[in-house]
């Protein structure tokens, strides 16, 4: 009988399992698919720290500097992290908020700075900066491989004694006020600690112990376009003026996702994993407008994924409901870049009864009933799964 069961083998669940195993906690990971079999491999996988709250920026900075950059030494193997530099592009209407948020990020030691369009153009000659009034620049930002990151965490967790089983969890099991395990399609499994990290599929599991999660499944899309040989790379950008993010990818490709491509779903089971034609056309147009070298770039591939969206686009994290139950859900498209630090925090919370960062307790479920929703200076950035 394991001490802990983690439900969900995406990047967040994998990070939690890794950190529990590091602490010597006997851990079993369950997922109806294989590792990284849900939304994680469809992630945009940006690694950046530009957030409108200090807690999010701090978690992303720890993930970058203590995990993604030194991955080989800290975890082992490779996560595909590639440093490109990151820029957040703002129009005149967002300049005040941008100044506020960069100052907020700098206070938690994020290496970021405000940069004028002319200077940004010197850093990346491929950018057409029409409509950009000011930018934030993170020289250490970039992207990683979401599947390699997830599998890397799980591989090391297994070497440390954790186990993975491909099983669908159908409900949580309680006795009195305590969690006692999970029910699966193959029968019951016992554990005194259960962590639910199953993304948009978490709601029915929480409901089995009387918890109603305000999570809504949302379909979002990404497209890959082929870069010419004359453009070997470019900055990773979030373009709040045009409403997209873009980053380089391996084999001369560029990944793009759009702000206005959200599709709210009735459930997380019935959705098209292929991108819509209108989405691809709009993505191609916007990408070519901002990076003229990519105008008319050949479309290579595309995919869609599911976000577990909450009303304030912030997660539900920590102990909830019966004793021994922990949630790590509702990431709303921003889980990937913070997953390493979040796994460390939740493992600490489980072992010590409190997280390293007390402000993580604000990510509780009650905030949605109490009107304590968490918002930053401006709306969440363009999102992709995780």
Predicted features, each with a name:
Residues 212-214, 227-324:
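Active-site lid/adjacent beta-loop-alpha segment flanking the redox-cofactor pocket in flavoenzymes
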Residues 21-40:
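Glycine-rich FAD pyrophosphate-binding loop
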Residues 1-12, 28:
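Beta1/beta-strand and adjacent pyrophosphate-binding region of the FAD-binding site
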Residues 136-192:
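Helical element adjacent to the flavin cofactor pocket in flavoenzyme catalytic cores
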Residues 146, 285-386:
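C-terminal catalytic lobe of FAD-dependent flavoproteins
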Residues 58-59, 88-97, 136-155, 272-279:
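Short beta-strand to alpha-helix junction loop
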Residues 37, 187-234, 353:
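Central helical "cap/lid" subdomain
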Residues 44-123, 243-245, 287:
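Dinucleotide-binding Rossmann-like beta1-alpha1 core, especially the glycine-rich loop
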